[in-house]
C-alpha cells in the first residue's frame, strides 16, 4: 500500500511539472514610440497595441509617445522605456538605419523590439502594410482611369521605408505604360496636408497640364485637392495611401480625390503585439517581416469600407 502511495505521488508530480514549464511570460510594461500622434493613423495604432496588450495582461502599463519625426527625441523615448523596465517596445522608426543603436541597447536590456509601419534596423521583427502593393494599386487606378496616357505626378514624402516602397510600387506600374509621362517624382510634401498644398501649388504653376497625382498619404492628397481648388484646376485624378477618416469624407464628397489604398493601423499593432508576445516566450516568427495586404478604397466601394474608427 505504501509503495502504491509513493507511485501515485510520483505520477501526480510528473503531471504537475509541465504546467509550471508551460506558464507564459506576460507583458507588464509596453512602450510605443510613433512618428506623430497628431496623425489619426498612429492614434489608431496605439489603441490597437493597448487593447491587445491588455488582453494578455489587464494590468499591463502601455505608454504611447509621439516622436514628432525627431530622431533624437525617439532615442530619448527608447532610453526612457529601457529605464522603465519595458518588456516590449513598438517603434515607428524616424530613420530605419539611424535608430539601430537605440534598438540594440534595448535588446541588450532584454526587451523585445518590434517595428511598426516602417522598417527598423535591429528590431526583432517588423509589421507593416505591403506598401509596394499599396503604391501599385493606387497608381494602377490612375493608369486605368487615364486609359494608359497622360501627365502624372508622384508626390513624394519623408524618406522612410513605407514611403519609398509606395513610390517604387507606383513607378513600377507607370513604367509599364509608355504614354504615361511622370512630370515629377522627387518633391517631399512632408506627409502633411500643408506640404501637399504647397508642393501642388508649385506643380500647378509649373505644369500647365496635370492629369493625375499620386500622393504618398491621405493628408498630402487632401492638401493637393485644396491647391487644385484654389487655382481652379479641374479634372485631376488624385489617389493616395492610408484609408484615413478624412479620405473617407473626401471620397463621399465633391473633391478630386478618387481612391486610397487602405491600411489598418489597429491590426498592424495587434499583430505586432502578438509577435512580440511570441518572441517574449521563445517563439520566433517565420519571417522577420510581416506584410498586411492593402485594399483600394474608391468612390464606388467607400460605403462598405470599415475604416480606422470602426468599432473593434
Question: What positions do the PLM features span?
Answer:
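A residue-level marker of the well-folded mature domains of exported/periplasmic proteins
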Residues: 2, 21-312
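Gram-negative bacterial Sec-dependent N-terminal signal peptides
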Residues: 1-21
Amino acid at each position: 500500500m505504501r509503495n502504491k502511495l509513493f507511485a501515485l505521488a510520483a505520477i501526480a508530480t510528473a503531471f504537475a511539472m509541465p504546467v509550471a514549464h508551460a506558464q507564459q511570460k506576460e507583458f507588464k510594461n509596453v512602450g510605443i514610440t510613433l512618428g506623430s500622434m497628431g496623425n489619426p493613423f498612429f492614434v489608431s495604432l496605439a489603441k490597437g497595441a493597448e487593447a491587445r496588450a491588455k488582453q494578455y495582461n489587464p494590468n499591463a502599463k502601455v505608454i504611447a509617445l509621439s516622436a514628432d519625426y525627431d530622431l533624437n527625441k525617439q532615442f530619448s523615448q527608447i532610453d526612457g522605456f529601457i529605464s522603465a523596465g519595458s518588456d516590449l517596445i513598438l517603434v515607428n522608426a524616424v530613420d530605419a538605419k539611424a535608430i539601430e543603436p537605440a534598438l540594440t541597447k534595448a535588446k541588450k536590456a532584454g526587451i523585445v523590439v518590434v517595428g511598426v509601419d516602417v522598417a527598423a534596423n535591429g528590431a526583432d521583427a517588423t509589421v507593416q502594410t505591403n506598401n509596394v502593393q499599396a503604391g501599385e494599386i493606387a497608381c494602377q487606378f490612375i493608369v486605368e482611369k487615364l486609359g494608359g496616357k497622360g501627365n502624372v505626378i508622384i508626390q513624394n514624402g519623408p524618406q522612410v521605408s513605407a514611403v519609398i516602397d509606395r513610390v517604387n510600387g507606383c513607378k513600377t506600374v507607370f513604367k509599364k505604360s509608355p504614354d504615361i509621362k511622370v512630370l515629377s517624382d522627387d518633391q517631399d510634401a512632408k506627409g502633411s496636408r500643408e506640404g501637399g498644398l504647397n508642393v501642388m501649388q508649385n506643380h500647378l504653376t509649373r505644369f500647365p497640364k496635370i492629369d493625375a497625382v499620386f500622393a504618398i498619404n491621405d493628408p498630402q492628397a487632401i492638401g493637393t485637392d485644396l491647391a487644385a481648388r484654389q487655382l481652379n484646376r479641374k479634372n485631376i485624378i488624385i489617389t493616395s495611401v492610408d484609408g484615413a477618416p478624412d479620405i473617407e469624407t473626401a471620397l463621399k464628397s465633391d473633391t478630386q480625390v478618387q481612391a486610397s489604398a487602405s491600411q489598418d493601423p489597429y491590426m498592424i499593432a495587434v499583430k505586432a503585439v502578438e509577435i512580440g508576445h511570441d518572441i517574449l516566450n521563445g517563439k520566433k516568427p517565420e519571417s522577420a517581416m510581416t506584410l498586411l495586404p492593402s485594399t483600394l478604397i474608391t468612390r464606388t466601394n467607400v460605403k462598405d469600407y470599415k475604416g480606422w474608427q470602426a468599432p473593434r
